[in-house]
């Protein structure tokens, strides 16, 4: 096991997978995203790969989930990304950490 993989494991050791999936389900995230299969939006394992090694990945994804900025679909149309609804910011961070752990 490499040092990088050890850091990766420790960085995501505290992720509550069940809570992350429940929050995603409550917010309808799985309508557009799969964990390992593209739908209207990219698969989350592809999102994770895109941000691998980016020290600001968590902040960037939290901003994406809270801003409602437009996203472009495969057919070329754009829509505002649904804003993640949660009472506790820690839950949003847990979801992002789950996505990045894939």
Feature map (PLM): residue ranges:
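Bacterial N-terminal signal peptides
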Residues: 1-6
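Protein kinase-like catalytic domain
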Residues: 33, 66, 99-100
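Electrostatic cytochrome c docking/interface patches
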Residues: 8-24, 50-52
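The canonical Cys-X-X-Cys-His
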Residues: 27-35, 95
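Axial heme c-ligation environment in periplasmic c-type cytochrome domains
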Residues: 40-51, 64-96
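Post-signal/leader-peptide non-cytosolic segments of secretory proteins
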Residues: 54-64
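Solvent-exposed loop/turn segments at secondary-structure junctions
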Residues: 37-39, 102
């Amino acid at each position: 096991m490499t040092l990088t993989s050890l850091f990766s494991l420790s960085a995501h050791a505290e992720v509550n997978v069940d809570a992350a999936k429940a929050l995603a389900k409550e917010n309808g995230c799985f309508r557009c995203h799969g964990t390992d299969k593209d739908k209207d939006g990219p698969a989350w394992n592809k999102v994770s790969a895109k941000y691998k090694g980016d020290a600001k990945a968590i902040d960037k994804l939290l901003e994406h989930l809270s801003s409602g900025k437009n996203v472009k679909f495969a057919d070329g149309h754009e829509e505002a990304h649904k804003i993640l609804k949660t009472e506790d910011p820690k839950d949003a961070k847990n979801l992002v950490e789950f996505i990045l752990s894939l």
